[in-house]
Amino acid sequence: PEADELLLTLKGPNGSFRLSMSASASLPFIYLTPTNKVSPLTAPTFCMVLRKHIANGRITKIYQPGMERIINFEIEHLNEMGDLCHKVLIIELMGKYSNIIFTDSDGTIIDSAKRIPASVSSVREVLPGRAYTIPATQEDKYNPLTVDSKQFVDIISAKPLTVSKAIYSSFSGISPLVANELAHRAGLDADSPVAAYSHDELLHLGSNFTWMMEDIKNNRFTPNIVRDGNEPKEFSSIELTQYSDLTVTKYESISEVLELYYSERNT
């Protein structure tokens, strides 16, 4: 529908679905939706490239590299000669650096929603013919799904930071919102230094951390939106207990949450 937005129709044994994704700098997203959007009279070039290659393709694998804000779709399709080919559609949800990138099976970029030349980024070009490289955003962080409560305490205690910042700067995939939620559940002030708390208090924080990670590993999610009156403030796939003065509404799926949140933000 837009230059930085895609709406894919997916067909499977359980019916048809629409997958909406956007690389908007202000509101990047990806979610399943029942809503169709009116297509422009002239489709964006990137959309035409995708139609040419994967209009009748089959998604064979969907995965997230580590805890990165990236989702990869591996797709197989038949080319004009009837040969089986493989492509990868990648969405990177990284604020103003968000992008949707389409590559060959060997990682060569075919095209992207946003082309990034060397004049814009000397670190990472995103242009047809270039090799795709994953953004180096989480390399120095720990995987939170493999850390126990004692390791957690050792890691954050080594940083002269506030509780919240020590958490989200140490572990991949943990946002300031989640870090604040962990502090709240443990009864700690997210903005106080880690050094202000005793070892036992930090162990209690570590226990809350591991409990949350167990919920994530076992797909125990609580999709919700936090509103101040009618204004959406936050959304999350985990239960948020830190907003006692605001309205927290739970929903059946994270896709429902995302569609509501972004539609309300845009009105």
Model-identified regions with their sequence ranges:
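Extended, highly charged segments
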Residues: 1-267
